[in-house]
């Protein structure tokens, strides 16, 4: 089976003085998260589309879905204390409700990346089925510098080898669950990226090409850019 999990656990602290998490802010008349969900319901390969949200925002999320989304595959669950725990909550939900099979995969995506394309979703599904672990990336445009002391440059990696991470990140569910459960509590605090967990466990993580417009809306500037993208698509 193929599942999607939209990660809607962000608090929106970088968005400034707003009274709700950023995924619920309006984008051309609809909450950002609705734009994101709409991209996933267009894909009929998903058995369920899981929305993982903070406990205090479950009812609000359900109300939004009733208003905008008419697809019985969409369900809302409580997210975890951090990103990886939220992913695991999605897997635990599937395990409890349907059981886990060896080839079950989950496509995890940021709720605040509303411009994901059908192509990116399809490639994540196909590559996760084949390779087990997938990350979505775009080539780095700017030169990246590393500073281990936060004062002087300690390294400048070759730009041609550097990519910027996006989402989705997609996984064989049994495999990522096993690797996560093998971590110590301290490791769980340090390893905040699920793909890093796979790498440390010796798994190869397949790259899927993302897109320049697959932006993450985390700041007021990002929201302005997102509105401009939507307006441009309306005009065209």
UniProtKB/Swiss-Prot annotation:
Q: Which UniProt keywords apply?
A: Cell wall biogenesis/degradation, Nucleotidyltransferase, Teichoic acid biosynthesis, Transferase
What catalytic activity does the UniProt entry give for this protein? D-ribitol 5-phosphate + CTP + H(+) = CDP-L-ribitol + diphosphate
Natural source organism: Listeria monocytogenes serovar 1/2a (strain ATCC BAA-679 / EGD-e)
Could you tell me which pathway this protein works in? Cell wall biogenesis; poly(ribitol phosphate) teichoic acid biosynthesis
Under the GO molecular function aspect, what terms does this record hold? 2-C-methyl-D-erythritol 4-phosphate cytidylyltransferase activity; D-ribitol-5-phosphate cytidylyltransferase activity
| Keyword Cytoplasm assigned | no
Which InterPro entries does this one have? IspD/TarI (IPR034683), IspD/TarI_cytidylyltransf_bact (IPR050088), ISPD_synthase_CS (IPR018294), Nucleotide-diphossugar_trans (IPR029044), TarI (IPR034709)
Stated EC number for the protein is: 2.7.7.40
- Which SUPFAM superfamilies does UniProt cross-reference here? Nucleotide-diphospho-sugar transferases (SSF53448)
Q: In chain numbering, where does the site feature Positions ribitol 5-phosphate for the nucleophilic attack fall?
A: 159, 216
The name of this protein is: Ribitol-5-phosphate cytidylyltransferase
Write out the function statement from the record: Catalyzes the transfer of the cytidylyl group of CTP to D-ribitol 5-phosphate.
Q: Into which family does the record put it?
A: Belongs to the IspD/TarI cytidylyltransferase family. TarI subfamily.
